[in-house]
Amino acid sequence: RPHESGDFTDGEQGGMAMDDLIDAGDRISLILGNPGAGKTTVLIRLIRQYADLWHNGDRSILPLRINLNAVTEGQTMDDALRTAFNAGFGITTTEDRKRMVFAHAEQLLAEGRIALFIDGLNELKVSRPELFIASLGSFIAKYDKCRFHITGRIHEFAACREAFRRIEGCGVYHLCEISLDQILLYLRQLGLPEERIDEFRLQILRAGIEELLGTPLNFMMIAALLLGSTEYKIPAVGNRGELLEMFMRSSLSVRSR
């Protein structure tokens, strides 16, 4: 939530397990991280949590994902929602049918029965992203019963900060980066011999790139380079399996609530 002064604090206030984010009580969760930190993966994990609740009998909340890299010039958040809704549910019927279905979606939004997962504040390709961000702020204010989970990059969030500063119930979270010790443990779990793990550790320390290992994407590339494809296979993009599970077992740094 906003700081008592009305501003987001830059100081860390504690930690939170990623799986607990859905129960954090924030109406808006801003999930920030460096490139390759797993922001989209966290979002997908949250969507699955909502889906599990749905399958277990809680049919009140429908998760809907919106990719901001698909927003085109001049579009507002309402336009992005309509596009995502049509694509997500395969609505290819007549325009009248689309309007009727979307009117029902708007009713669900007004009732707070849709949770929106908005991915990529940093991926807006429009010439004036601040206009879209303003429309997003208005959208959040309009549908004040809905929950929003939004991802973006830490350093680029400053440009959006003002738009979220005045919104009540907004939590800001940073993805914590994984430590070298945790990565070495992961390599042991993969079955690498201790001598290769020690060699990997020494190469990292000598090169002074320990901090670069902190995100899944960087780790995949560095491990493949130093260990070789015979010992470490780069997981498929978008399906990094056990590697991302290790990062998901890390935590979120609570920046402001």
Give the predicted meaning of each segment:
Residues 2-256:
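P-loop NTPase signaling cores
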